[in-house]
């Protein structure tokens, strides 16, 4: 059985192309009042072009867990496995983290050269800042240096242009451990 996740959505993959939203509503008829939305999409990464995946969103995580039950449901007469799913915006949030060393800096005039930036930013590695872009990333050795840089740089002016600095985002090291082809989280 799949582990419980804090989500209010279930995914039902490998549905026939003939399955309708009505079929999904019927499959979850005992939870009709708790259902917020039902969506059917063409299944990606499928060899069979007619397969669909259904998403059923419930009001609460508790409702979702009740509907999950034993992990399967009968849709249009066929037993189908259930998976906990998250909306795309929830999945994206989990893939990035706020960096403890990198700083995103915008508002940099195009004609600013690397020497000026190095003098302004101090001891760091600079990436980005290519011609035509008014932003760059500066990576410091530790979080204390990052904090000092944020305090110093934010609202500073260079060549009359006000700079804006904030901690950068970086990819979370989530790896592929525990991910299966059919796992929709």
Swiss-Prot record:
- What domain of life is recorded for the organism? Eukaryota
Keyword RNA-binding listed: yes
Identify the keywords attached in UniProt to this record, alphabetized.
Repeat, RNA-binding
Query: Locate the RRM domain: which residues?
Result: 8-87, 101-170
Cite a single GO MF annotation: RNA binding
Among Gene3D superfamilies, the record links this protein to:
3.30.70.330
UniProt-recorded name of the protein: RRM domain-containing protein ECU09_1470
